[in-house]
Amino acid sequence: VGVVAGTLNTLVGGGTLLVLPLLVSLGIDPLVANGTNRICVAFQALVAGWTMNRGLERSRGSKAQEMPTIGWRPLMLVGGAAILGALAAIEIEHLDKALFRQVMGWLLLVAVGAFLWPRPDPPLADPLTDPLAATPGIKFYIGGLICGFYGGFIGAGVGALIVLLLTTSMRLPVVEAVRWKVWWVVAMSTASGFLYLSQDVFDRAVAIPLIPSYGLGAYLG
């Protein structure tokens, strides 16, 4: 399951929709399962980012960096929002465990529906002829905050949301959006993962097999 989830996370997102319900069904506390998964996803996304960048360098050589880009500053935005999302998850679970289970369940259902809902192909733009196409606007930053918060809170299907944001608000090609999606997931999962670790919301017995299987899936993806 970890290999399949890692591959899905790399290509389109949604691997957490497989892993998180499985961990909860095995009797692991939902918050612990969520925190453990966030930490494992950070490692998976790092492997995916390294693999994608290496592939771009091999296929395009020195032109790999000439693709349309959104810059690295939004990573700080989604990372900070992810910390807030993780804090919200921890606080809700501490206040009412049953409420957190209900919120997680409904979010997973919504994420599955959104993941399967057909979406039309967004119009693409050439950033060389249309400078505004690759210029972040207010909708982009609001969307980034929402993605970051949700990524730290649960994160199921957040990769697909990020790709949707980048292809609509920035009008990036899907391939380029997927590449940037990976680094957004690295930022939000690493930031929220450190918080979960600091609060001891982490199961080492689960992470030991999950991290390498996630990494293998990311490499294959």
Report each predicted region and the residues it spans.
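Small-residue hotspots at the loop-to-helix junctions and early N-terminal turns
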Residues: 30-38, 178-182
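Juxtamembrane transmembrane-helix boundary motif
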Residues: 1-8, 14-30, 51-154, 161-169, ...
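Transmembrane alpha-helices of multi-pass small-molecule transport proteins
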Residues: 36-54
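Residues at secondary-structure transition points
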Residues: 13-14, 37, 104, 181
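Hydrophobic alpha-helical transmembrane segments of multi-pass integral membrane proteins
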Residues: 176-192
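Transmembrane alpha-helical segments of major facilitator superfamily
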Residues: 40, 180-184, 209-210, 214
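Membrane-embedded alpha-helical transmembrane segments of multi-pass integral membrane proteins
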Residues: 44-47, 111-114, 188-191
